[in-house]
Amino acid sequence: TVYIDDAVHPWRGERWAHLLADTLPELHAMAQQLGIPRRAFQNRRSGAHYDVPAALRDTAIALGAVAISVQAL
C-alpha cells in the first residue's frame, strides 16, 4: 500500500506531502507514475519517502495512494 499525508509541510514557497509505502518497490513505482525522479528518494531513519508537491497529491490519490494525516505517520 502507498500512502500520502496531508500536504502541510512548507518549503521554498510550496507545500509538500510525504509519499510512503509498505515496500520500496511500491514506493518507487508510484513516484515514477507521478513523474518524480528517483534522485528525490529520501531514505531517512524516520522512514523512506518522497516529498511530493501539494499539486500532485490528488493525482497520487487517484492512482491509488491512501490519504493519511501527518499524525498517522
Pin down the residues of each PLM region.
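Generic structural "secondary-structure junction" signal
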Residues: 6, 21-22, 43, 52-54, ...
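Short, compact, well-ordered microdomains
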Residues: 47-73
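The feature represents the first ordered module of a protein
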Residues: 1-27
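A short, structured beta-strand/loop element
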Residues: 21-46, 62
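Terminal leader/tail segments of proteins
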Residues: 2, 12, 16, 33, ...
